[in-house]
Amino acid sequence: RVLFRSRLIAGLETPTEGSIQLERKVLWDPYQQVQAEERNIGFVFQDYALFPHLSVLENVMFGLKKIPKHERQSIAENALKHVSMSHHIYSYPHTLSGGEQQRVALARALAPKPHVLLMDEPFSNLDHRLRDQIRQSTIDILKQTSTTTIIVTHDPEEALQIADQIILMHQGKIIQSGTPKQLYFQPKTLFAARYFSDLNEIKTQIQDQQLHTIFGNIDIPKHLTSNNEIRCYFRPHQLRVNRIKTENSLAAKIISSNFLGYSQLLKLKIEAEDKVLSAYVEYSQHYDQADTVYLSLDLSQCFFYESNDSIEIHQSST
């Protein structure tokens, strides 16, 4: 659905209703339409869509048909220089790696100096070892050229790393928009919170204008005004694991431990509750399966939602 909207913006698909505007200029509405080739919008496809029978230089020149030929070559060569592909101008797509093809597709899209560049999952086809490197170099190029870019991705980590603004969509609707930090630390819905990380969940009880949890009590967040059941959510890294019992800590037994290199993912069963929680700890702490540990949690850093309404705004501190 998100990709379909990118194709609508580019003019590759026709809307059934509504309007599309760019810098207050109508690109499409029921009364007027600007054709795709007149919109000056670049598009980098997921599979790059390079022409196999054209050289790298010719692929980039292809999008510059309205410019005199001698100028086209100069512009294309400059675009390839920007993406560090000058040494491949006479190569053909089948001789290039996935990362090199991606850079050629980027050069072709940037050469006409588009008002907006659309990119569909541009890094998903790359080897995971090269993905971070190519992604960062692409973002650097886009910033150097001051190109406004809409990137479609289903990778939450990628969105947090590269975006200035994120628009999170679910079932065809915008759930939340804002900076990466706003969406991560202040998710307005349970869906938004879960999209960017795994969550632990515990029950609460309302008593004397407070929420009572197994980790202590906290004032009821002001945005939660109904009498519906409220649940507390928190990320695995927020759960503190210690070998020594402290105030408000709960005894738990490690039922599994997964080695992640720099950290461990622990599954913990709270002894006083029929509840299993997840926690990340540094591997240097050397926790083993069946160890007894003590858990504590800063409730002021948790998210609170009504159990039957994932639209409610959360309680969180940044």
What are these regions (language model features)?
Residues V2-L3:
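Short, small-residue-biased leader/transition segments that mark boundaries at the very start
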Residues A10:
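Helix-to-loop junction immediately C-terminal to a conserved catalytic motif
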Residues E13-T14, Q21, K65, K143:
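A position-specific signal in ABC ATPase nucleotide-binding domains
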Residues T16-S19, Q171:
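Conserved coupling/switch loops of ABC nucleotide-binding domains, chiefly the family-specific signature
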Residues G18-D29:
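Conserved ABC transporter NBD signature motif
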Residues A36, N40-G42, Q46, L50-F191:
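ABC ATPase nucleotide-binding domains
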Residues F185-Q207, Y233:
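C-terminal boundary and immediately downstream tail of ABC-type ATPase nucleotide-binding domains
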Residues L199-E201, Q210-T318:
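Non-catalytic connector elements of ABC transporters
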